[in-house]
Amino acid sequence: MAEASVDLGTGDNLEQKILQVLSDAGSPVQIDQLLKKLQVPKKILNQVLYRLKKEGRVSSPAPATWSLGGDGASGDGAPEIPEDSAAQPSLEERILRFLETKGPQRALHIAKALGMTTAKEVNPILYSMRNKHLLTVSDTQMWTIYRSSQEGQERACSGVGQESPAVIYQQNPINMICQQGPNSLISISNSKAIQIGHGNVMSRQTICGDPGPGTPHHAPLPVLEDAAAQDTPPGTHGAQLIHLNKSMLRRVQLGHGNEMNLERDPVEHPIFSFSSSPPESTTTADPETAFNMQTPEPGPHPEGGTTQIVHIKSCLLEDTTVGNNNKMTIHRRSKGGTKESADSQELKEDTGASSEATPPRSCLHTPSDSTLLTSELTAMALGDGSPQITESMLREDEVQAAETCQTQD
């Protein structure tokens, strides 16, 4: 040990040993491993490491982690700056920029983007950023920015409250909708006239001419008005986790207290199929069906309570509301411009499915523990079956029938 102390005084022998250990490892090495192999005080080891980093001979891709070779940025790691303060802020900025560009990612993808090899190397900084409210992680281990990178850093420093989510305009056939908050990842494909959240209001009046035989009419997509963002304090309704896979969504509401007033196109939409087989009834026991919904009534909930969890797989949703106390009114307008009512036969023709595979219209309530699903859901309301709250989907000739059903409930 006396000889080792002499070598540390010069530093030459320690530098060679550090370079040899990093070269033999072939991947980033934690500071604890270096201390164990070199048997030197941590303070002296850090001094030599930062001197080598300044010379471009080693780099620090993560906090308390070192590798052989420079990082392409000379002079940014002065020895007098503590290790964590020098490496961690720079790495946080790189992670925030990566997620801001690429969207939600798994830890392994983030690690590879930073030049690392395993998720374990980046997990400590990810969870540290989550504790600072810079990042959030979903139940599927997808990491995303809590807000934007700049706003997230300002929030971590000043403790400013979370802003309401931005209004989302649907511009592509497949859209990624991310609510910037903890445990709120929503992924939806093939959406049209859709509302996500609580207390939304959508009203669209479409006057359809004669679009020609066999040509469906596609009106301009509406702008979503998030009334909950204005009237409801942040965090009142809690988190949402929604997965709708392989779903054709038309006029869909997700959340509580939404209201939608639309006019149905006179030309029937073509039947959409995700496979060559026709629609058929399925149950939650089938491997290709997934449904799980937990929707307490709107309002403050205990800490950790989840407001809405929806898993729907391989389902076509048309004129559908998911949540509590939603209201949807759909008017049918003929080619001549006059309104006409919709009946069960027209509803049946919309779906192209048998009466056995088509759920009843109007006051249909599916509880959260429902075991029956159809691969095509039309004019259907999904909720928690609460007797105090009614999910309604009304057509002009069904208002009276809906009121009767509500009384019976």
Curated annotation (Swiss-Prot):
Classification via Pfam families: RHIM, z-alpha
UniProt domain Z-binding: residue ranges: 8-70, 85-147
Chain positions of cross-link Glycyl lysine isopeptide (Lys-Gly) (interchain with G-Cter in ubiquitin): 17, 43
Family matches, as InterPro entries: RHIM (IPR025735), WH-like_DNA-bd_sf (IPR036388), WH_DNA-bd_sf (IPR036390), Z_dom (IPR042371), ZBP1 (IPR042361)
Biased composition annotated in UniProt, kind: Basic and acidic residues: 337-351
Skewed-composition ranges (Low complexity): 270-290
GO cellular component annotations of the record: cytoplasm; cytosol; nucleus
Motif (RIP homotypic interaction motif (RHIM) 1): 183-207
Region (Disordered): 59-87, 269-307, 323-369
Keywords: Antiviral defense, Apoptosis, Cytoplasm, DNA-binding, Host-virus interaction, Immunity, Innate immunity, Isopeptide bond, Necrosis, Nucleus, Repeat, RNA-binding, Ubl conjugation
Single biological process term from Gene Ontology: defense response to fungus
Location of the protein in the cell: Cytoplasm; Nucleus
Gene3D superfamilies assigned: Winged helix-like DNA-binding domain superfamily/Winged helix DNA-binding domain
Molecular function GO labels: DNA binding; double-stranded RNA adenosine deaminase activity; double-stranded RNA binding; left-handed Z-DNA binding; RNA binding
Notes on how activity is controlled: ZBP1-dependent necroptosis is normally inhibited by RIPK1: RIPK1 inhibits the ZBP1-induced activation of RIPK3 via FADD-mediated recruitment of CASP8, which cleaves RIPK1 and limits TNF-induced necroptosis.
Post-translational modification: Ubiquitinated; polyubiquitinated following influenza A virus (IAV) infection.
Motif stretch (RIP homotypic interaction motif (RHIM) 2): 241-265
Keyword Membrane tagged: no
UniProt remark on domains: The Z-binding domains recognize and bind left-handed double-stranded Z-RNA structures, but not A-RNA, the right-handed double-stranded RNAs that are structurally very different from Z-RNAs. The second Z-binding domain (also named Zalpha2) acts as a molecular switch regulating pyroptosis, necroptosis and apoptosis (PANoptosis). The second Z-binding domain is essential for sensing influenza A virus (IAV) Z-RNAs.
Subunit details: Homodimer. Interacts (via RIP homotypic interaction motif) with RIPK3; leading to RIPK3 activation and necroptosis; interaction is enhanced by CASP6. Interacts (via RIP homotypic interaction motif) with RIPK1. Component of the AIM2 PANoptosome complex, a multiprotein complex that drives inflammatory cell death (PANoptosis).
UniProt function note: Key innate sensor that recognizes and binds Z-RNA structures, which are produced by a number of viruses, such as herpesvirus, orthomyxovirus or flavivirus, and triggers different forms of cell death. ZBP1 acts as an essential mediator of pyroptosis, necroptosis and apoptosis (PANoptosis), an integral part of host defense against pathogens, by activating RIPK3, caspase-8 (CASP8), and the NLRP3 inflammasome.
Protein name, per record: Z-DNA-binding protein 1
Gene of this entry: Zbp1
